[in-house]
Amino acid sequence: MANIKKGDLVQVITGRTQAKGGDRGKQGRVLSVLVERNRVVVEGVNFVTKHVRVGQTQRGSKTGGIETVEAPIHISNVALVDPESKKPTRVGFRTETVEKDGVSKTVRVRYAKKSGKDL
């Protein structure tokens, strides 16, 4: 089970400060997780400028120009935000037994180490 999943609220914990034009301290939702590259794409963080070639679409319109898109950031540079204190926290796992229809099942649950709340 992964520490950070799509849809989690994370905070950038390394990099240049916001006063110098960086992203450290910014919070955003995880848009996608690139597991094989150990990277995540965070909403509103790590913008890059892309030059897109003008090309034909199927409907005949031409698209292209300069776009700004979110680039992946390494997973070690972000921390999950505690739902209670809204500050970065580490993630822990604990096993819980859940009974459903008379059958007990063991499930791994993620929790915030600062507050102990389930994620």
From Swiss-Prot:
Cystines in this chain: none
GO MF terms, alphabetically ordered: rRNA binding; structural constituent of ribosome
Alphabetically ordered keywords of this record: Ribonucleoprotein, Ribosomal protein, RNA-binding, rRNA-binding
Gene3D superfamilies: 2.30.30.30
GO BP terms, alphabetized: translation
InterPro entries: Rib_uL2_dom2 (IPR014722), Ribosomal_uL24 (IPR003256), Ribosomal_uL24_KOW (IPR041988), Translation_prot_SH3-like_sf (IPR008991)
One GO location term (cellular component): ribosome
Pfam family, one: ribosomal_L24
Reported function: One of two assembly initiator proteins, it binds directly to the 5'-end of the 23S rRNA, where it nucleates assembly of the 50S subunit.
Quaternary assembly: Part of the 50S ribosomal subunit.
Sequence similarity: Belongs to the universal ribosomal protein uL24 family.
PANTHER family, sorted: MITOCHONDRIAL RIBOSOMAL PROTEIN L24
The protein's name: Large ribosomal subunit protein uL24
Taxonomic lineage from the root: Bacteria, Bacillati, Actinomycetota, Actinomycetes, Micrococcales
Gene, per the UniProt record: rplX
